[in-house]
């Protein structure tokens, strides 16, 4: 094979992926789709530029226009999230968490996070960014019935451990965390309160779910490509939570600590997404939550065991389903079958699963944010639930269901809640 043929093959696979994705029902809770305007920014000449440091205080020349875009971004993000500071330089949510752990913690300091099985993100773990900083990781007590942090036990834990940092948020996140209840206790013992909003940033922007910075969080970290429908990247939003020296340590941890150049084409895409969310975010977030609830209810009616019935199933973009009663391999069996039918989601540990079941966990994690952005509403959620029933409960051939999924998805090819297409119109 010639090198040109390698080039052609790569471009072919990209084209095939884009075609395939546009004909599937993507329910991965950590993904989304960007608007044409954002795509233009990400594919721009900003990808060739390097910038280090703050706008107007760069270590490289030639940043005149980059600086203007980043300053607009700081203005829009602080307005959107009512924060005192917005740092667009982290290149991912994990990178943002890494900066916070390195900026505010020292090796041996205690941090309380959500356990992986309970929905905590890997960057919070001893084997992730927290552990890399040398932090002593403790996990929140968890209440299986409410699918949330146990407030009474957590309050006791904070007082006993006197941690340096407490972290709310995670990757399995159907219900708001008790920030309002526990932040005052954390501050009594001198802890910094961090909220990992990676999954729910777009919901927070639209006034749904919860408002961490008003409920007591000092710092909010996030990725920018889940319910916040931007390019892959990160952001740190925070209040004037400490003295200038402490805030300077956080900023120093970002650059030169864990970020050099901050991928300026993605930064520009984040800025346009912030403008889209200021214009359309309220409507988008509201419809995401409506769709998640509608999908959860429809799945329950179809015979699935949906988690959180007593709490209304979900208050976020996520729907959690226990499929262990359908097959011993649970999500490890269900997710590949659904992929054959053109329904893309991921297997997921549930709080009662041991870590050893990571490849055959009980659950499926479902997110509706991308299908909401292409214009789907509550009625479409019922159809999706029925497709899933046909594959997993009725044991219909996934290839047969795939044909129906293909034609169903053909009707939803525009990216709404954007300046390109505006709001979807319900017929």
Curated annotation (Swiss-Prot):
PROSITE patterns: SHMT (PS00096). InterPro entries: PyrdxlP-dep_Trfase, PyrdxlP-dep_Trfase_major, PyrdxlP-dep_Trfase_small, Ser_HO-MeTrfase, Ser_HO-MeTrfase-like, Ser_HO-MeTrfase_PLP_BS, SHMT-like_dom. Pathway: Amino-acid biosynthesis; glycine biosynthesis; glycine from L-serine: step 1/1. Its EC number is 2.1.2.-. Pfam families: SHMT. SUPFAM superfamilies: PLP-dependent transferases (SSF53383). It is an enzyme of class 2 (transferase). (6S)-5,6,7,8-tetrahydrofolate binds at residues 120-122. CDD domains: SHMT. The modification N6-(pyridoxal phosphate)lysine is found at residue 226. It is found in: Cytoplasm. GO terms for cellular component: cytoplasm. Belongs to the SHMT family. This is Serine hydroxymethyltransferase.
């Amino acid at each position: 094979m010639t090198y040109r043929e390698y080039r052609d093959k790569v471009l072919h696979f990209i084209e095939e992926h884009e075609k395939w994705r546009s004909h599937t029902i993507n329910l991965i809770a950590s993904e989304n789709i960007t608007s044409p305007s954002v795509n233009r920014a990400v594919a721009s000449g900003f990808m060739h530029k390097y910038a280090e440091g703050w706008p107007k205080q760069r270590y490289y020349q030639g940043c005149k226009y980059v600086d203007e875009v980043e300053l607009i971004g700081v203005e829009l993000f602080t307005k959107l999230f009512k924060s005192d500071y917005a740092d667009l330089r982290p290149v991912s949510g994990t990178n943002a968490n890494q900066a916070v752990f390195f900026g505010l913690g020292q090796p041996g300091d205690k941090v309380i996070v959500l356990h992986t099985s309970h929905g905590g993100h890997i960057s919070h773990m001893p084997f992730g960014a927290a552990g890399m900083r040398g932090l002593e990781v403790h996990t929140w007590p968890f209440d299986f019935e409410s699918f949330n942090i146990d407030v009474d036990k957590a309050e006791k834990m904070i007082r006993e451990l006197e941690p340096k940092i407490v972290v709310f948020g995670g990757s399995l996140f159907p219900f708001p965390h008790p920030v309002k209840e526990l932040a005052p206790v954390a501050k009594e013992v001198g802890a910094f309160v961090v909220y990992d909003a990676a999954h729910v940033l777009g919901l927070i922007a639209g006034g749904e779910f919860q408002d961490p910075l008003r409920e007591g969080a000092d710092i909010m970290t996030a990725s920018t490509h889940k319910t916040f429908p931007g390019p892959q990247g990160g952001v740190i939003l925070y209040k004037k939570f400490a003295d200038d020296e402490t805030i300077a340590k956080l900023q120093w941890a970002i650059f030169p600590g864990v970020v050099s150049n901050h991928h300026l084409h993605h930064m520009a895409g984040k800025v346009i997404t912030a403008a889209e969310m200021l214009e359309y975010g309220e409507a988008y977030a509201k419809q995401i939550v409506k769709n998640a609830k509608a999908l959860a209810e429809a799945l329950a009616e179809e015979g699935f065991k949906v988690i959180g019935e007593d709490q209304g199933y979900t208050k976020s973009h996520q729907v959690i389903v226990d499929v262990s009663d359908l097959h011993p391999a649970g999500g490890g069996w269900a997710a590949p079958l659904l992929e054959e039918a053109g329904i893309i989601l991921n297997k997921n540990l549930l709080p009662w699963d041991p870590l050893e079941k990571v490849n055959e966990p009980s659950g499926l994690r479902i997110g509706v944010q991308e299908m909401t952005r292409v214009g789907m509403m509550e009625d479409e959620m019922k159809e999706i639930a029925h497709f899933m029933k046909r594959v997993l409960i009725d044991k219909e051939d996934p290839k047969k269901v795939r044909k129906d999924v293909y034609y169903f998805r053909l009707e939803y090819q525009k990216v709404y809640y954007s300046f390109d297409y505006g709001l979807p119109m319900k017929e």
